[in-house]
Amino acid sequence: GLIVQPDGSLLITPKIGGESIHRVRVFEVGASTDRTYLLRLLVGAYVAGFTAIHLEAKGRLPPFVRQLVREFTQMAIGQEVVGETDSSIVIKDLLNPAEMPFENTIKRMHLLARGMQQDAMAAIRGHDAALARDVVARDTEVDRLHWLVARQDNLIVIDAALSRRMGIPVNQAAYYFQVSRIVERIADHATRVAHNATALSDREAGAAMLDVMDEASALALEIFSESM
């Protein structure tokens, strides 16, 4: 069928119904499964847009798998355990993508990244190690939002009906993803500043050097905000 996109272009698709596309990813796990590798598989399946993730073991699930799943559901927005047995776990996406517009997510990421950079600089000037550690912790929230944008971008590529419901053409979704990736990198740099603030918390920096750093940071944040 042909679908008229919000930008006036035509999309040719074999599926024009309003129902969502359900995709399931199955992972076999065991005692020898690497923890870090499994977490990457879960995050990858989430970002790729799978609506359900099944973890299956030949015997009982190792305890570390259940713990890792709990950590993953706290990291990934909308993911919840909906089924669990001794040998399997089912994780399902319960978030309606249309309720999380790209623009709102990007704005939230901008505010977080901006606040992180401001607080990281304040931590350096004030020798505040606790504030610096808080900045580092906030980077996880920016990552969560970036993963959500990446997931929704992939979902729109896969599901034309979702593109219509959200009023976002495929090329615009890709643009939001690129912006999200840049903002996530800005937050990463703020995290590096915070790590340095922790290392320098017991050292005294010259007033002139601090003024130069504050001026550079303020200019960078001004450009950042204007670009948004």
Where in the sequence are the language-model features?
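Cytosolic, long alpha-helical scaffolding segments
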Residues: 1-228
